[in-house]
Amino acid sequence: MKPKQSGNQPPKTGLVKEYFRNGQLCSVGKYRDGKKTGIWKYYLRNGKLKATGKYSKDELAGPWKWFRENGNLLQTGTFKNGKQEGLWKRYHPNGELYDEGRYLDGKKAGLWKYYDAKGKLSRMKNY
């Protein structure tokens, strides 16, 4: 979400909390000179954590985690310069690993492993 800025207002700086229309917290994080920076947290309408990770000069940077509505982990991964980089993992709704592999400059690279809902390796693919 980009904050609305108009006219000659100075860029946002400091801690910012954004809310859904129902008043529930939507996100919390810091701005520096109008750009997202540091750790941000995003929430679902039910109040549970949806995602958390770091920004650097308005770009995704470093490790991120996403969660399902029930609180279970959905996926984890790392960003560099706003692009997916390094090891990424996604999980089935039951918490078992769904797939894992690496990204290089925002694209799948090398061997990726895919698992069934019981956690058993079902296939592998090279990218």
Where in the sequence are the language-model features?
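Glycine/tyrosine- and acidic-biased, solvent-exposed loop/turn segments at the edges of beta-strands
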Residues: 1-127
